[in-house]
Amino acid sequence: MRMMFSPELVNPPFGDPGLIVDFNVERRALLFDLGDIAGLAPRKILRVSDVFVSHTHMDHFVGFDLMLRLCLGRPTSLRLFGPPGFAAQVEHKLAAYTWNLIENEPSSTRIGSTRRASCT
């Protein structure tokens, strides 16, 4: 029986946190926490459709820049999910870059927030 997904730690147990879950039946993956992702092959990073960040301490968010660099200009969306205030933190990181080299590139960035719902 073929597994539908393959979970893999991004780094050794005492390295930056990260778990990638690659869906074997689809061309996509989920990434939980965005620590140091330099050890992942670019082709694997490009499969990521959704990133879930638990909090933005450096060891959980330092991989954002590499993810951004690889995903700029790709035709598919990358969705980021995080704790309250996360959208503003992402917006500040994006604002810190000079974007003059990609003026003619078709790209779209949407930043928004959603609310958490709970059932009791």
Where are these regions (language model features)?
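Binuclear metal-dependent hydrolase catalytic cores
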Residues: 1-120
